[in-house]
Amino acid sequence: MGRAFEYRRASKEARWDKMSKLFPKLSKAITVAAKEGGIDPDMNPKLRTAIATAKAQNMPKDNIDAAIKRANGKDSSDIKTIFYDGKAAHGVQIIVETATDNPTRTVANVKSIFSKNGGEMLPSGSLNFMFSRKAIFEVVKPSGDIEELELELIDAGLTDIEENDGTLTIYGDYTSFGTLSEGIEKMGLEVKKGSLQFIPNSTVNLDESAIGELERLLDKLEDDDDVQAVYTNIE
């Protein structure tokens, strides 16, 4: 998703009722990370980052601990991360990231949302060549030299860095998530958010009318309980 459109969508996240919308998604991200890499944060960079992201959103410690414990529960083995591809009007391409214990339910819901809101599902993997998977971290901008920070993190896998309103967005290839996470920690940077995301290789520039037309579809997808993230090629 283009950065300008991403910031626009972030304003919606800020308005979400955290208890009913954001916290369950953060909790599921923690459980999935713990299930994939173990429940010890010291040995699991993805889990450490998921916890840091939750803390940055003021998620209570009890919720975080419960999410980690669920990774060892009898139901956790059924939770899977599944991606669905789709398209909408104006050349918009969409990748939907889900975490679900019932893929049959999830695919039916996602397909219904697309079909009822002017979109269409595509075979899974259809858009892989249109997007690049990246490790992306948002950190509080430190007081020191940004160029020096950039040089320090290149060896850890940094490929790009952006600055916006006191926040640094750090990019790396998805295979560098662990080393980049550790490099950021070693530098003492405060993580606001960290995850693997799909970034479009090319974008479409839409006017306000077209964006308004598409936002209903995107809202419906993001509001589904099984959906963790929605990525688009909108500038």
From Swiss-Prot:
Transmembrane segments: none annotated. Its main location: cytoplasm. Disulfide bonds: none annotated. GO terms for molecular function: DNA binding. It is found in: Cytoplasm. Keywords: Cytoplasm, DNA-binding, Transcription, Transcription regulation. The keyword Transcription regulation applies. GO terms for biological process: regulation of DNA-templated transcription. GO terms for cellular component: cytosol. PANTHER family: TRANSCRIPTIONAL REGULATORY PROTEIN YEBC-RELATED, TRANSLATIONAL ACTIVATOR OF CYTOCHROME C OXIDASE 1. Belongs to the TACO1 family. This is Probable transcriptional regulatory protein CFF8240_0424. It comes from Campylobacter fetus subsp. fetus (strain 82-40).
